[in-house]
C-alpha cells in the first residue's frame, strides 16, 4: 500500500498552551477533546501534529521529538518567525517555547535544519529534504568550531558544551580567520548565551559583532548572521 500518513502524538502539560503557541505559527485545530483524556490535533498545510495532556508533566524533562522534512527550511522558518514577531514582538530564542535558526547540520550530511521547542518541551526538528544539495563542508577553524557547536546545541540540546566549543575558538584568534565566520560564531555564541540565560554574555558578543570590519562583499555573505543578531537584540530589549 502507499499514501500512508504518520502523525506524531506528543506529550504536554496543557493542551491550551499548545494550541495558543501553534496558532502563532499558523496551525489550526482539527480535533480537540477534554474527556476521558485531554488531547488536540493541529494542522498547518500538510503538517499534522497531535498532543496529549499529562497532569504534572514537566516540559524540561520531555523526550518528545519528531522530524519534519521540507523543500525549503528557510521559507518555513520565516513564516514561523513572522508569526512570533506579530504575537510576541520578537522571535523566541530562549526558554520554552523557543526556536533555533536554520543552519547546516554536520550530523545531517550538511543539510539545513532548525528546531521549534514547544511549550511541552517537544523538539520539532525541521530538516531540508535530502533531494536538495547540502551545503559545502565548513573550512577554517572557526567554521569547523561552528559546525561542532551547532550539533551540540541545536541537535543535542547541550548549550553548555556548545558554549565551551565556541569560547575555545574565540579565545585563540588567528590572522587567517575569515571575518565572516567570526561574525557568525559571535552571533551564535550570543544565541547560545541566551539559551543559557546569560544575557550579559549575549550583549558582549553582539557588541563584538559591531566591531568586526567587513567589506561590502563580506557584509553580503554575513547577511543571515546580521539578521540573527537583530532578532537577538530585539529579544534582549
Residue ranges and their predicted role:
Residues 30-65, 70, 123-128, 192-198:
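Conserved short beta-strand elements that form part of the metal-binding/catalytic scaffold
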Residues 1:
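Short, conserved helix/loop micro-motifs enriched in His/Cys and acidic residues
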Residues 5-16, 44-49, 88-93, 128-136:
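Short N-terminal helix-initiation segments at or just after the protein's N-terminus
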Residues 10-49, 159-176:
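Core segments of cupin and vicinal oxygen chelate
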Residues 4-13, 59-85, 88-165, 173-237:
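Vicinal oxygen chelate
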Residues 78-88, 168-173:
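Short regulatory "switch" loops immediately downstream of catalytic or recognition motifs
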Amino acid at each position: 500500500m502507499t499514501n500512508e500518513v504518520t502523525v506524531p502524538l506528543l506529550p504536554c502539560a496543557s493542551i491550551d498552551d499548545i494550541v495558543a503557541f501553534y496558532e502563532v505559527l499558523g496551525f489550526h485545530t482539527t480535533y480537540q477533546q477534554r474527556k476521558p483524556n485531554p488531547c488536540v490535533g493541529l494542522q498547518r498545510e500538510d503538517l499534522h501534529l497531535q498532543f496529549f495532556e499529562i497532569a504534572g508533566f514537566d516540559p524540561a524533562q520531555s523526550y518528545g521529538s519528531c522530524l519534519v522534512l521540507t523543500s525549503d527550511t528557510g521559507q518555513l522558518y520565516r513564516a514561523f518567525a513572522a508569526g512570533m514577531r506579530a504575537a510576541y514582538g520578537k522571535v523566541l530564542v530562549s526558554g520554552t517555547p523557543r526556536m533555533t535558526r536554520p543552519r547546516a547540520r554536520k550530523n545531517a550530511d550538511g543539510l539545513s535544519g532548525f528546531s521549534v521547542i514547544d511549550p511541552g518541551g517537544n523538539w520539532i526538528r525541521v530538516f531540508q529534504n535530502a533531494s536538495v544539495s547540502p551545503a559545502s563542508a565548513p573550512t577554517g577553524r572557526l567554521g569547523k568550531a561552528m559546525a561542532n557547536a551547532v550539533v551540540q546545541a541545536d541537535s543535542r540540546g547541550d548549550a553548555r558544551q556548545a558554549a565551551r566549543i565556541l569560547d575555545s575558538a574565540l579565545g585563540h584568534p588567528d590572522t587567517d580567520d575569515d571575518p565572516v565566520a567570526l561574525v557568525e560564531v559571535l552571533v551564535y555564541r550570543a544565541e547560545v548565551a541566551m539559551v543559557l540565560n546569560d544575557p550579559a554574555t549575549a550583549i558582549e558578543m553582539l557588541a563584538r559583532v559591531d566591531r568586526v570590519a567587513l567589506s561590502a562583499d563580506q557584509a553580503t555573505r554575513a547577511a543571515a548572521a546580521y539578521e540573527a543578531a537583530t532578532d537577538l537584540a530585539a529579544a534582549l530589549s
